[in-house]
Regions:
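N- or domain-start disorder-to-order transition segments that initiate the globular core
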Residues: 2-54
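M16/MPP (pitrilysin/insulinase) zinc-metallopeptidase core fold and M16-derived inactive scaffolds
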Residues: 51-133
Length: 135
Protein backbone atom coordinates (compact mmCIF):
# COMPACT_ATOMS: atom_id res chain seq x y z
CA UNK A 1 0.00 0.00 0.00
CA UNK A 2 1.49 3.34 -1.01
CA UNK A 3 1.50 6.53 1.04
CA UNK A 4 -1.36 8.92 0.19
CA UNK A 5 0.09 12.40 0.72
CA UNK A 6 -3.14 14.24 -0.18
CA UNK A 7 -5.11 12.22 2.39
CA UNK A 8 -2.40 12.78 5.00
CA UNK A 9 -2.49 16.56 4.47
CA UNK A 10 -6.26 16.57 5.03
CA UNK A 11 -5.79 14.53 8.23
CA UNK A 12 -3.04 16.85 9.47
CA UNK A 13 -5.12 19.96 8.71
CA UNK A 14 -7.97 18.55 10.82
CA UNK A 15 -5.71 17.45 13.68
CA UNK A 16 -5.38 19.49 16.85
CA UNK A 17 -2.46 21.84 16.39
CA UNK A 18 -3.37 24.16 19.24
CA UNK A 19 -0.92 27.00 19.58
CA UNK A 20 0.15 26.81 15.94
CA UNK A 21 -0.98 28.56 12.78
CA UNK A 22 -0.93 26.58 9.52
CA UNK A 23 1.19 28.58 7.07
CA UNK A 24 1.38 26.12 4.17
CA UNK A 25 0.46 22.54 3.27
CA UNK A 26 1.46 20.74 0.11
CA UNK A 27 2.19 17.37 -1.43
CA UNK A 28 5.93 16.81 -1.86
CA UNK A 29 5.80 14.54 -4.92
CA UNK A 30 9.55 13.91 -5.19
CA UNK A 31 9.57 12.60 -1.61
CA UNK A 32 6.14 10.92 -1.68
CA UNK A 33 5.35 12.97 1.42
CA UNK A 34 2.96 15.48 2.91
CA UNK A 35 4.53 18.75 3.98
CA UNK A 36 3.28 21.35 6.44
CA UNK A 37 4.76 24.60 7.63
CA UNK A 38 3.43 25.80 10.97
CA UNK A 39 4.13 28.91 13.01
CA UNK A 40 4.10 28.73 16.78
CA UNK A 41 1.75 31.55 17.80
CA UNK A 42 3.53 32.50 21.03
CA UNK A 43 7.20 32.33 19.96
CA UNK A 44 6.95 32.74 16.19
CA UNK A 45 9.08 29.60 15.73
CA UNK A 46 8.70 27.93 12.36
CA UNK A 47 7.93 24.20 12.43
CA UNK A 48 8.24 22.02 9.35
CA UNK A 49 6.43 18.67 9.37
CA UNK A 50 7.15 16.09 6.68
CA UNK A 51 5.00 12.98 6.92
CA UNK A 52 5.49 9.80 4.90
CA UNK A 53 5.63 6.03 5.36
CA UNK A 54 9.33 5.91 6.37
CA UNK A 55 9.78 4.20 9.77
CA UNK A 56 12.74 6.44 10.58
CA UNK A 57 11.51 9.48 12.49
CA UNK A 58 13.66 12.62 12.34
CA UNK A 59 13.66 15.72 14.52
CA UNK A 60 15.94 18.72 14.33
CA UNK A 61 15.98 22.05 16.05
CA UNK A 62 18.08 24.85 14.64
CA UNK A 63 19.03 28.37 15.58
CA UNK A 64 20.60 31.26 13.74
CA UNK A 65 24.00 31.79 15.36
CA UNK A 66 25.79 34.48 13.36
CA UNK A 67 29.38 35.01 14.44
CA UNK A 68 30.43 38.27 16.05
CA UNK A 69 34.13 37.42 15.96
CA UNK A 70 36.44 34.46 15.28
CA UNK A 71 36.51 33.00 18.82
CA UNK A 72 34.31 30.00 17.96
CA UNK A 73 31.77 30.88 20.64
CA UNK A 74 28.91 29.29 18.66
CA UNK A 75 30.69 25.92 18.69
CA UNK A 76 31.39 26.22 22.42
CA UNK A 77 27.71 26.96 23.03
CA UNK A 78 26.74 23.94 20.90
CA UNK A 79 28.75 21.65 23.18
CA UNK A 80 27.65 23.41 26.36
CA UNK A 81 24.01 22.98 25.38
CA UNK A 82 24.44 19.21 25.53
CA UNK A 83 26.11 19.17 28.97
CA UNK A 84 23.14 18.26 31.12
CA UNK A 85 20.18 20.15 32.54
CA UNK A 86 17.97 20.25 35.62
CA UNK A 87 15.84 17.50 34.12
CA UNK A 88 18.86 15.43 32.97
CA UNK A 89 21.58 16.10 35.57
CA UNK A 90 24.35 14.01 34.02
CA UNK A 91 27.71 15.33 32.88
CA UNK A 92 27.22 14.41 29.23
CA UNK A 93 23.70 13.30 28.21
CA UNK A 94 24.87 13.12 24.59
CA UNK A 95 27.34 10.32 25.45
CA UNK A 96 24.66 8.55 27.51
CA UNK A 97 22.27 8.72 24.55
CA UNK A 98 24.94 7.33 22.22
CA UNK A 99 25.48 4.38 24.58
CA UNK A 100 21.89 3.55 25.48
CA UNK A 101 19.66 4.74 22.68
CA UNK A 102 18.26 3.07 19.59
CA UNK A 103 19.00 6.20 17.57
CA UNK A 104 19.78 6.01 13.87
CA UNK A 105 21.36 9.47 13.98
CA UNK A 106 22.38 11.72 16.84
CA UNK A 107 24.52 14.81 16.51
CA UNK A 108 24.89 18.56 16.77
CA UNK A 109 26.55 20.76 14.18
CA UNK A 110 27.72 24.34 14.01
CA UNK A 111 27.79 26.04 10.63
CA UNK A 112 29.08 29.55 9.89
CA UNK A 113 25.61 31.05 10.49
CA UNK A 114 23.50 28.44 12.31
CA UNK A 115 23.62 25.58 14.81
CA UNK A 116 21.45 22.47 14.44
CA UNK A 117 20.69 19.53 16.70
CA UNK A 118 19.33 16.59 14.62
CA UNK A 119 18.19 13.21 15.95
CA UNK A 120 16.53 10.15 14.41
CA UNK A 121 15.19 6.79 15.54
CA UNK A 122 12.88 4.07 14.22
CA UNK A 123 11.62 3.37 17.75
CA UNK A 124 8.76 5.69 18.84
CA UNK A 125 9.56 5.65 22.56
CA UNK A 126 13.27 6.17 21.97
CA UNK A 127 12.55 9.00 19.52
CA UNK A 128 10.36 10.83 22.05
CA UNK A 129 12.95 10.34 24.80
CA UNK A 130 15.76 11.73 22.64
CA UNK A 131 13.64 14.74 21.66
CA UNK A 132 12.91 15.36 25.33
CA UNK A 133 16.63 15.44 26.14
CA UNK A 134 17.34 17.82 23.24
CA UNK A 135 14.47 20.15 24.16
Amino acid sequence: MSFDAVKKIEELKKSDITGYELVKAEVLKDMNSAGLILRHKKSGARVVVISNDDNNKVFSIGFKTPPFDDTGMQHIIEHSTLCGSRKYPVKDPFVELCKGSLNTFLNAMTYPDKTVYPVASCNDTDFKNIMDVYM
